[in-house]
Amino acid sequence: LRNQRKLGRFIADKAARHRFQSPLLWTTSPEQVHLLDHLEYDGLVYDCDRDWEELPPLWEGALANNADIVFAASPLLADRLAPCSSNVALLPNGVNFPLFSRPSDLSYDPLPQTTGPVLGWAGTIRPELDLEPLLYAARTMPRWTFVLLGPQGEGNSLLPRLRQLPNVVLPGGCPMAQVPDWLYRCDVLLDFLRDDRTCDDLVSCRMLEYLATGRPVVSMLWPDQIEPLPDVVYGAHSDQEFLTLCRHALDEPPNFAAQRRRSHAAAASWPLRCTQVVNILTTAGLL
């Protein structure tokens, strides 16, 4: 709590220096409930984009109860927060659609020596990321190339075994502007589960970035989970099904569902999300 008081003083000092008047406080984590007693504000927003099961439920309950508006990134999150607030609004994740929908410069090939199918994933390779399906597929299909683009965080237990496979590429991180080059180099894009995230109806920013490219997507699901976007995403429940659906995705006719995928992403573009936020806050009298 002492750190929260210190952070509260820091924020208050910055707000005073910039002559903030009637500020709208935007919070994104239940931990920030401890700042409320140390800040002056005229409106409070709680923007929830994940399940915070590792934090005390009372923190999130208090934050949602105090908030004038609660934004929830999925229907399940909205249902969970509804008992704590009568002003819960659904606000799904968004995407930089112009960046990811623009075809890559074909003169640049991030994998110039690679032939055959390329299947890729982009993001931080966290310890909680379940890469078992990738390991199974890479061992079974040695002529396919699998790319894990992104920083390796604190280390994933399967990385040592993946590094030993000649058909697994670990290029590390890159600037966001270069990520589309890698995605467009892939024939199929992949999404995996995280052991610390169990909210199964959340459409991630990564998924929206994938969809903006129009490329086929194969995603792992929890055992009882239903794919939220079944018309544009191949959803697998096991390592074997993951490999089978990767084969189906590679065999997908050109442009079979590319436009539907881009349409899903276009509907989640950040300008449209911002318009939704402005309309909701205006209706609530916060703007």
Question: What kind of region is each of these model predictions?
Answer:
Residues 111-129, 134-138, 147-149:
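Conserved donor-binding/catalytic core segment of Leloir-type glycosyltransferases
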Residues 9-14, 38, 51-70, 77-80:
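Membrane-proximal helix-turn-helix segments that form the acceptor-binding/catalytic region
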Residues 116, 150, 156-181:
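Nucleotide-activated donor-binding/catalytic signature segment of Leloir-type glycosyltransferases, i.e.
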Residues 76, 94, 103:
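Carbohydrate-associated surface elements
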Residues 17-19, 104-118, 283:
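Nucleotide-sugar donor-binding and catalytic loop/hinge architecture
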